[in-house]
Each structure stands twice: as structure tokens, then as C-alpha cells.
From Swiss-Prot:
Name listed for the protein in its UniProt record: Ribosome maturation factor RimM
Gene name in the database record: rimM
Homology family: Belongs to the RimM family.
Keyword Coiled coil: no
Comment text on domains: The PRC barrel domain binds ribosomal protein uS19.
A single GO cellular-component term on record: ribosome
Native organism taxonomy: Bacteria, Bacillati, Cyanobacteriota, Cyanophyceae, Synechococcales
Length: 176
């Protein structure tokens, strides 16, 4: 039986860097080793099938969140330009080991959402979005979808083993 690969987007190629084929990546991952350590990665444009590529090396630009990486076979600026707009992916089975109490954002998908004041279930986490801060997309029991900022003040409790998380929404968050 074939296991279905779940792809994690870890960044997006935003520009070529110099003349030797390096590219700039805007990361969507908190794990720097994904952009620095050599090894297999995958590139995807829109809904195309991911294509395997070897990351040779990478470094973070000092004072910025951008990484500059070098891929095998990408050895000039024109080849680097052709990669702009592609997403950088990894297989979700290659997630870093975490300390106790930590979790991967992907683990939040499918969790039931409960209100802090009365523990009533109001919906389920259906997607994750990174827009400066991480946002949880929650499908309410009514069918409506809302974005919930993933910050400790609004999501104070997460029980992965029990399959739920608690929200303490500010007034009006679910009324829009």
C-alpha cells in the first residue's frame, strides 16, 4: 500500500541572487535548517506535481528573514529567474523533532475548536495561513469559515492528544 505524501510548503522563491544561480527564499518555516542543510527538497509552481531538487547550501541574510540558497543544476541567473514564484516543499514525514510541549502547526489540522468560557464546541481547524502571524482557518458548525489569529491570548490551550484546542476570541471575531 502506497503512503500518500503530505507536502509542507516551507517557503517561496522570490528572486534570483547574483549571477551564479542562487535564489532568495521568503520562508514560511521556523526551522532554519530547512534552508541551510543540504539535501532533497521539492519545487512546485501552482498545482503542478512537485519536482525533486537538491539543495546544496544556504544562508540567512543578516538582519532579514530571507534566505539565499543554492540548488544543484541551477548555475546561472536565467535558470534562477525561472524558479521565481515556485514554492519550496518538504515531505511532512521529515519534520524536526520537537521539545516536550511543542508541536508542528500541521498537527492542528482537524482539531475541534472549543470556546473558553463554556467549553462548547464551535467548529474545526481546516487550514493554516501565514500572513505575518499564523492564522487558523476554522469552519464553524454553521458552515461559515473564519480566520483566528494563532496567538496565546486567543488560543490559550491546545490538547493534541484529546483532539481539541480552546479559543478565547475577542468580541466580534466570529460575527463578521
Amino acid at each position: 500500500m502506497c503512503k500518500k505524501i503530505i507536502w509542507l510548503t516551507i517557503g517561496k522563491i522570490v528572486a534570483p541572487q547574483g549571477l551564479s544561480g542562487k535564489v532568495r527564499i521568503n520562508p514560511s518555516s521556523d526551522f532554519p535548517e530547512r534552508f541551510i542543510k543540504s539535501g532533497d527538497r521539492w519545487l512546485q509552481y501552482d498545482n503542478e506535481e512537485p519536482q525533486k531538487i537538491q539543495l546544496n547550501s544556504g544562508r540567512q541574510i543578516p538582519g532579514k528573514s530571507i534566505y539565499v540558497v543554492e540548488f544543484q543544476g541551477i548555475d546561472d541567473r536565467e535558470k534562477a529567474k525561472a524558479l521565481v514564484g515556485k514554492k519550496l516543499l518538504i515531505d511532512s514525514s521529515h519534520r524536526p523533532t520537537l521539545a516536550p510541549g511543542e508541536f508542528h502547526l500541521l498537527d492542528l489540522l482537524g482539531l475541534k475548536v472549543r470556546l473558553k468560557n463554556d467549553h462548547r464546541e464551535i467548529g474545526e481547524v481546516t487550514n493554516l495561513t501565514s500572513a505575518g502571524n499564523d492564522l487558523l482557518e476554522v469552519r464553524l458548525l454553521s458552515g461559515k469559515k473564519v480566520l483566528v489569529p494563532f496567538v496565546k491570548e486567543i488560543v490559550p490551550e491546545i490538547k493534541l492528544q484529546e483532539g481539541w484546542l480552546m479559543v478565547c476570541p475577542p468580541p466580534g471575531l466570529f460575527d463578521l
